[in-house]
Amino acid sequence: VAISARRENLLNEISKSHDGIFSYPLDVTDSEKCKSVFNDIKEKFKDIDISVFSTGIHDPKSEKSLNLDKVRQIMEVNFFGTVNSINAVCDYYKNRKSGQISIVSSVAGYRGLPAAGAYCASKSALTSFAESLYFEMKRKDVKVTLISPGFIKTPMTDQNDFPMPMIKSPEFAAEQIYVGLVKKNAFEIHFPKSFTFIMKILQILPNWIYFKILDKGMKKISY
């Protein structure tokens, strides 16, 4: 297994404590670095079956008042960072004519949520991108999977100042993703189901009903 992230110390900690895991430090906003790191991974592993791309930052404080620098940063990391990574591997999988590209989006991409405009926009863009990529890669027998988690307890969600329904642990998320990728054949892996089904219902509601429900439910957020 090859893993990449910006924090080299954490990567090394993981790779040293688990046999068969190799770390490759990477900032996904650097498109050329994405290509060079993937070339290093190819050289090491020779044959790659699946690539999972998960990038995400969020700053709820800045989202309560429009901060253009933060909006650009969130889009640059969450959306363009993922696209940079996918761009680095696409030709490999097309030529291989098999394999799987998995994109971690979020249920926040289903509809706009309070105090999360840039984050929702970045994840909505990823969801649409994954749907479009599905058709392109299917012609080459390459599978594309969209992963849409609900609230997962991480340092990022620790910033939120509102109750997060049905929040789950990273271990739960990892198990759901693993089972979905290995044992199921669906385009989208979404979890926890009890929460994501509610979000999918909200997704198809008329705007006036959706806004009324969200406005009532999010009163605890201060602007």
Annotate each language-model stretch with its function.
Residues 106:
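Residue(s) in the substrate-gating loop at a strand-loop-helix junction
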Residues 146, 162-197:
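C-terminal helical subdomain
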Residues 17-32:
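Rossmann-fold cofactor-recognition segment
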Residues 54-59:
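Conserved NAD(P)H cofactor-binding loop of Rossmann-fold oxidoreductase domains
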Residues 1-13:
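Conserved glycine-rich Rossmann-like NAD(P)H-binding loop of the short-chain dehydrogenase/reductase
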Residues 86, 122:
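Active-site helix of classical SDR
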Residues 62-73:
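Substrate-binding pocket helix/loop in short-chain dehydrogenase/reductase
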